[in-house]
């Protein structure tokens, strides 16, 4: 190293000091002033960790006076460098002495950092390259948005999400039967729309009682942080914005809030991309008098591009209300109820033809004639011959059936806007077995109920029923010691005996009220020392997570989880199969919701439902009405809401003792239940169900996601990423790791990691059984954050490594260049599907030959070892003259790769979108539910994407200089 006063150097170990100036040379020591910070440093000249800063022709540099220049020529005089070129502001020829360079310097380009001695460790270079590859892999995945959520891989749910989530501004009705996961389907669609940029602002409208359930589901399953808006929140948000809805991107609110004129006006002005309405079957409509709730949703549906309506099965509440919901999605298409009925008659033939195809048997002449007439513009004779052939491979026959079914579906009046799965069409459900346990009414309750009746009071009929169904509540009103009821209640004795005789079983206990749940936990703990935990609405989300985790724990966990009605909303415990209903809710929907905590797809055992009840009370009467009238314990009851509405008055009269017509009520209920069930079964649309569960396509999506879950390379890459960043990883067993921030992290903060740490797993089954453990996939925010931190900074952009190989001459150099092919386009343009930021690797030998096709990255990387920054800087300086022509050669090779990439991307785009456009244009002639705006969107999209692809640029992202060593 030779030094001269006025030269500019940078510290290899303290690059944050900026550009230093040599101010003194004395003996073997040199002193530098770093003007940006005002600090001095003294170094021994022989081993100073310093790198000389000299720019090259073509670079743009700044002077200390604030003006910039483009370097044309570099000259040296008496050890100082002089830059000749043109000013960027005036265009004048000028000269700048290096002493007058701007002090606050940041080397952003990899070449600048390399020459300035800002050289990273070898593992950081590797993590950066892998991070770019992972981002590319994610962006090009056809299943983007489906892998990340903590949900079971259920084919029909994934199919609906895949089919709807990739549409522009989807407007659909999700009408699966209860227990089939409509909320999960909606969450998957929301997640997919957000990840792909098709949506950014989402409004979810739910009944008051479901706001918290949705908040928990969206956070725990989909890592989506929604905000619940009520009147108080709107008032509070007014300080930040005139329109409170603009203060958050993801909002959950109730219909009650939006009934207020001012709040509705604000919601209408809030530029939502997607609206989700849960329990949409409660939106009442008639042509003459639509309800206020319907009008609210209708007004929003007119201005929000994407709309998802979640509803009970379509005809559960009548055909007219089904039409009303379709009208919300597409008022131009569904404009008149009578016209809708007339059209339905027309495609009844389509459904019959689909039934014939789906049956799997030979087609009758009548069915063939029907298909030929329906598909008259196509030649279906070859497909018919394949279906009817005697000795044909079953796969070929099925392919022919599927082809015709798809053609029929495309002509189905509501095939694109309605998805409905029934338990009859979806496999994987357990049986339900009901066990009732009757006990005599304790004297204490008899006395309390007698006194309560004498005191009377102006209570509503429903309030009296609520008391009659929970006699412990009446007793508590007259008892100073509120908790003493459990000392004599025979249901508590039975529960204790049941738990003792089923010690190896996990048992979920549900009661109506939080007070009852807390009292039961105390009874189990104090009387028998049974390990139980509670779950109620007074607990925070984190407290509920801990309680759920304690219950899920196989060893040392709670045997029983005791939930209140509201506290259990949104939580499912499929790992348990024993359910105890300590009391009964009055509403059959709530009863189904309770049983649905265990009776879900993914439950591996038959669900055992136990009901301890008090004889000759309202409890016993309600149990008989549910069991014998609605079959509500052992079967799902999709018509329960309708039947409860029809028989509510008579039922309440029986339960309060005002009527003794229980037998007549049961007979009438049973007859009406059978009629409703038969009508619903007859109304099943096999073609619609075939489309809704996706068949072989759904199975293929599920298999792909299952394979992705088993990707050990991804797991290794993510763990390596966290290692390099400096995150502490503590293996806790049971497939779980605890992640914690550390003082030596590369970055000051890591969003998503708090002081207590986060427990994570790469195993989907573990995550599904434990609400407190996050499922790590490529889509999880904790992985995305790491990728963003690495690729968004200059971490790993430069590296110097040694290759120990005696077959090559010592000192031989290789230059590994990682380019990014990228273009700027709005996320909503979907450009990433065809050309996301794509790493292009070029490996050059000293003669400029590209070896990247012959030497793959991983095998090359394993042979390399790192060197410390000071030695690396010396090696770079010694190799500079050889590097300049290699960089030019590397750009040439990368340019050739870029041309191929853009050509392939354009061909893929035109092929995929062109085929979809042709298909939809052809279908529009036979199915009016194809919206013109969808076609126009596709045409515009193709034009825009072509322009974006033409602007694709190469950017050098990272450099690795490799030298052969024999030591």
Curated annotation (Swiss-Prot):
Instruction: Kindly state a single biological-process term from the GO annotations of this entry.
Output: regulation of DNA-templated transcription
Enzyme category, top tier = hydrolase
Complex and partners: Interacts with the RNAP. Has a higher affinity for the core RNAP than for the holoenzyme. Its ATPase activity is stimulated by binding to RNAP.
- Disulfide connectivity? none
The record, for HAMAP family, names: Helicase_RapA (MF_01821)
Q: Per its record, how is this protein called by name?
A: RNA polymerase-associated protein RapA
A Pfam family of the record is Tudor_1_RapA
Keywords carried by this UniProt record: Activator, ATP-binding, DNA-binding, Helicase, Hydrolase, Nucleotide-binding, Transcription, Transcription regulation
Kindly give the CDD domains that the UniProt entry links to this protein.
DEXDc_RapA, SF2_C_SNF
User: Which intervals of this chain are the motif DEAH box?
Assistant: 278-281
> Does the keyword Metal-binding belong to this entry?
no
Similarity comment text for this entry = Belongs to the SNF2/RAD54 helicase family. RapA subfamily.
Q: Where is the Helicase C-terminal domain?
A: 491-639
Function of this protein?
Transcription regulator that activates transcription by stimulating RNA polymerase (RNAP) recycling in case of stress conditions such as supercoiled DNA or high salt concentrations. Probably acts by releasing the RNAP, when it is trapped or immobilized on tightly supercoiled DNA. Does not activate transcription on linear DNA. Probably not involved in DNA repair.
Sorted alphabetically, which SUPFAM superfamilies does this protein's record hold? P-loop containing nucleoside triphosphate hydrolases
UniProt KW Repressor keyword: no
Record Gene3D superfamilies: 2.30.30.140, 2.30.30.930, 3.30.360.80, 6.10.140.1500, 6.10.140.2230, P-loop containing nucleotide triphosphate hydrolases (3.40.50.300), Tandem AAA-ATPase domain (3.40.50.10810)
Can you name one GO molecular function term for this protein?
Answer: hydrolase activity, acting on acid anhydrides
EC number(s) on record? 3.6.4.-
Q: What PANTHER family is this protein classified in?
A: DNA ANNEALING HELICASE AND ENDONUCLEASE ZRANB3 FAMILY MEMBER, SWI_SNF-RELATED MATRIX-ASSOCIATED ACTIN-DEPENDENT REGULATOR OF CHROMATIN SUBFAMILY A-LIKE PROTEIN 1
Q: Where is the Helicase ATP-binding domain?
A: 163-332
